[in-house]
């Protein structure tokens, strides 16, 4: 788990099989693809800042691993392959709200690695006829959110600060906006993509609503401390 915890799955114990493995070592997991219909490739390292500090690790986990999973899916004749892409591939847009047709300009190793994953999926769909779709997630939040990181994790960070009776730490003036997407909507999108007959497509998955960080603070209630942008 790169951002989650094993304990998050306690409520489904006995209903799932958990395999601990390294995706770069296919021998550890390749057998698990037998008799599987759908593959949801959600495994990756997350967050932008750590990717700047560790680009090699991010490319190994987010690009190389995607290649291995695609190859395993192809050889196992998987019926549907769904890739978790990222809205970060758009980079810093020139206009807000940002049109879907905006240029793809990844500006950090994490964003670039996720975009390269999209391109791998497109290539496998075109060349090998692997039925595959990529979904670009926008700032996912919800139950059992992590309490560290940036962007989508801001809810978890703020909730942890609220429970500790600490002020919310707001980077900059707090007027920056994000499209936050609730986790159950993400799950619905994943299932819809798997049930669809579409292939070699990329879709944005968001709430179509922008919310400022200051608005989140207002909704949660409490004091805030503004800190400079990095």
Which role does the model predict for each range below?
Residues 1-38:
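N-terminal Rossmann/SDR dinucleotide-binding element
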Residues 4, 24, 53, 61-64, ...:
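Residue-level signal for the nucleotide or nucleotide-sugar donor/cofactor binding architecture
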Residues 21-24, 163-230:
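C-terminal substrate-binding subdomain of Rossmann-fold SDR/epimerase-dehydratase oxidoreductases
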Residues 23-60:
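NAD(P)H-binding glycine-rich loop region in Rossmannoid oxidoreductase-like domains
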Residues 28, 67-72, 120, 180, ...:
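Conserved mid-core alpha-helix of short-chain dehydrogenase/reductase
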Residues 39-45, 81-87, 135-137:
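SDR active-site strand-loop-helix element
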Residues 50-51, 101-103, 132, 136-147, ...:
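A conserved pocket-lining segment of Rossmann-fold NAD(P)-dependent short-chain dehydrogenase/reductase
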Residues 53-68, 75, 79-80, 89-134, ...:
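Catalytic helix-loop patch of NAD(P)-dependent Rossmann-fold dehydrogenases
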